[in-house]
């Protein structure tokens, strides 16, 4: 029985990055032997055990064979005669197919160390093309390590194109797809994830609504980058630079989908793209069974982001309607995330990344002014029901008028 550290822990140590999760592979042992040593079984599909003291995962060395479509279409074979090299060959990338023995020696049968040096994301074997989830995983690794100069190897990108064109991506479950997408959006360069999917044809399969934005022009006066797809990539880049949460990043990815529906004859203007994009946002949210908080913010940002850009010009009545649309009195954080997404949209324009966005402070101040209105004096006057609601609305409108006048004097 031999135990090896494998995968990400070896890769990240060689890169000089913090090692958070450690995976182990056990060669030459059976399930019975693991149980006899006190390991607890947790693997439903193949033999994985938890260490009795550390709680870390130990998997028996195994091979796998394609047996159906999609991420789960594999049969596994785990036994004491499976070698370390056989176990490593089933892994996706060479940089993830290294092991380390108990003396700290690196076992690297597929050139992972050389690819780390060359900053290449390269597949281990042609079996890479059997698992469609690997398209998303490679794009996610590209987003993680772009800052270190990593790029996808040309031959690996070719295999990803093959997978994208095979229809296999459609066999991925919504849950698995969302898990990879959400993790990728939180990487240091989420725009690289989208770019790689675009380059290999997978974006057109998974999110055709986003793919449709590439090549669609916008007015150069407002968008020096012109291309709407390029703009979305820039907005995601700003999200990462400003450490935005997943809700904001997801909303930013989808905020301009309506521009993909504009007739070429109307380019580069995109009148009413906000409302035209809402059915597309709803469709993507359903497709990946996106969590409710991400769904709601994406829809609201899609509908109202241009309101934010024009915030300083909005009448108090329009401003009040905007705040009520967000239920800002009970859910102030959602409005704050909307403002953040709108600011990322404004900053995601080439050459305008550092331009001030006074709309953010103005909108947050307006929300504070409206929320400061107390219902207590109105209740003490004996108002209730619809009459109370109308009186509260008038009081909030008066507060917003006063706020706007005060800001106008500043």
From Swiss-Prot:
**Which GO MF terms does the UniProt record name?**
ATP binding; CCA tRNA nucleotidyltransferase activity; cyclic-nucleotide phosphodiesterase activity; magnesium ion binding; phosphatase activity; tRNA binding
Q: Which keywords are on file for this protein?
A: ATP-binding, Hydrolase, Magnesium, Metal-binding, Multifunctional enzyme, Nickel, Nucleotide-binding, Nucleotidyltransferase, RNA repair, RNA-binding, Transferase, tRNA processing
Q: What is the UniProt remark on how the cofactor binds and its stoichiometry?
A: Magnesium is required for nucleotidyltransferase activity. Nickel for phosphatase activity.
Record-annotated residues binding ATP? 8, 11, 91, 137, 140
Cofactors needed by this protein, per the record, are:
Mg(2+); Ni(2+)
A Pfam entry, by short name: HD
Reply yes or no: does the keyword Transmembrane apply. no
What superkingdom heads the lineage? Bacteria
Q: Which reaction does it catalyse?
A: a tRNA precursor + 2 CTP + ATP = a tRNA with a 3' CCA end + 3 diphosphate; a tRNA with a 3' CCA end + 2 CTP + ATP = a tRNA with a 3' CCACCA end + 3 diphosphate
Q: Does the keyword Repeat apply?
A: no
| GO BP terms, alphabetized | RNA repair; tRNA 3'-terminal CCA addition
Query: Where on this chain does CTP bind?
Result: 8, 11, 91, 137, 140
Coiled-coil ranges (or none)? none
Q: What is its EC number?
A: 2.7.7.72, 3.1.3.-, 3.1.4.-
Give all residue intervals belonging to the HD domain: 228-329
Binding positions for Mg(2+) per the UniProt entry: 21, 23
Family according to the record: Belongs to the tRNA nucleotidyltransferase/poly(A) polymerase family. Bacterial CCA-adding enzyme type 1 subfamily.
Any remaining note in the record?
A single active site specifically recognizes both ATP and CTP and is responsible for their addition.
Q: How does it assemble?
A: Monomer. Can also form homodimers and oligomers.
Present the record's domain note: Comprises two domains: an N-terminal domain containing the nucleotidyltransferase activity and a C-terminal HD domain associated with both phosphodiesterase and phosphatase activities.
| HAMAP family per UniProt | CCA_bact_type1, CCA_bact_type2
Job description of the protein: Catalyzes the addition and repair of the essential 3'-terminal CCA sequence in tRNAs without using a nucleic acid template. Adds these three nucleotides in the order of C, C, and A to the tRNA nucleotide-73, using CTP and ATP as substrates and producing inorganic pyrophosphate. tRNA 3'-terminal CCA addition is required both for tRNA processing and repair. Also involved in tRNA surveillance by mediating tandem CCA addition to generate a CCACCA at the 3' terminus of unstable tRNAs. While stable tRNAs receive only 3'-terminal CCA, unstable tRNAs are marked with CCACCA and rapidly degraded.
Protein name, please?
Multifunctional CCA protein
Q: What is the lineage of its organism?
A: Bacteria, Pseudomonadati, Pseudomonadota, Gammaproteobacteria, Pseudomonadales
């Amino acid at each position: 029985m031999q135990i090896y550290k494998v995968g990400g822990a070896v890769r990240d140590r060689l890169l000089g990055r913090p090692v958070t999760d450690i995976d182990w592979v056990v060669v030459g042992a059976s399930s019975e032997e693991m149980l006899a040593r006190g390991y607890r079984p947790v693997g439903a599909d193949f033999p994985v055990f938890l260490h009795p003291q550390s709680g870390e995962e130990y998997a028996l060395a195994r091979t796998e064979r394609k047996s159906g479509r999609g991420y789960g279409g594999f049969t596994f074979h785990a036994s004491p005669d499976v070698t370390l090299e056989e176990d490593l060959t089933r892994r996706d990338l060479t940089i993830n197919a290294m092991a380390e023995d108990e003396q700290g020696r690196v076992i690297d049968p597929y050139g992972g160390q050389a690819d780390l040096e060359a900053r290449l994301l390269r597949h281990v074997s042609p079996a890479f093309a059997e698992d469609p989830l690997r398209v998303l995983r490679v794009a996610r690794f590209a987003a993680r390590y772009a800052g270190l100069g990593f790029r996808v190897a040309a031959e690996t990108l070719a295999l990803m194109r093959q997978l994208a064109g095979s229809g296999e991506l459609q066999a991925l479950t919504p849950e698995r797809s969302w898990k990879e997408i959400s993790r990728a959006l939180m990487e240091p360069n989420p725009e690289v994830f989208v770019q790689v999917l675009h380059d290999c044809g997978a974006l057109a399969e998974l999110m055709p609504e986003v793919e449709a934005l590439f090549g669609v022009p916008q007015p150069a006066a407002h968008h020096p980058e012109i291309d709407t797809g390029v703009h979305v990539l820039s907005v995601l880049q700003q999200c990462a630079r400003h450490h935005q949460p997943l809700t904001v990043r997801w909303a930013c990815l989808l905020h301009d989908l309506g521009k993909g529906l504009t007739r070429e004859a109307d380019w580069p203007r995109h009148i009413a793209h906000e409302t035209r994009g809402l059915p597309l946002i709803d469709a993507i949210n359903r497709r990946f069974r996106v969590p409710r908080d991400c769904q709601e913010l994406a829809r609201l940002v899609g509908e109202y982001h241009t309101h934010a850009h024009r915030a300083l010009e909005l009448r108090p009545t329009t401003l009040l309607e905007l705040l009520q649309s967000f239920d800002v009195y009970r859910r102030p954080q959602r409005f704050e995330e909307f403002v953040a997404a709108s600011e990322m949209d404004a900053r995601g324009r080439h050459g305008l990344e550092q331009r001030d966005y006074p709309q953010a402070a103005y909108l947050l101040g307006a929300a504070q002014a409206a929320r400061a209105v107390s219902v207590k004096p109105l209740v003490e006057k004996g108002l209730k029901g619809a009459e109370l609601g109308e009186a509260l609305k008038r009081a909030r409108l008066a507060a917003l008028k006063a706020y706007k006048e005060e800001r106008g004097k500043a």
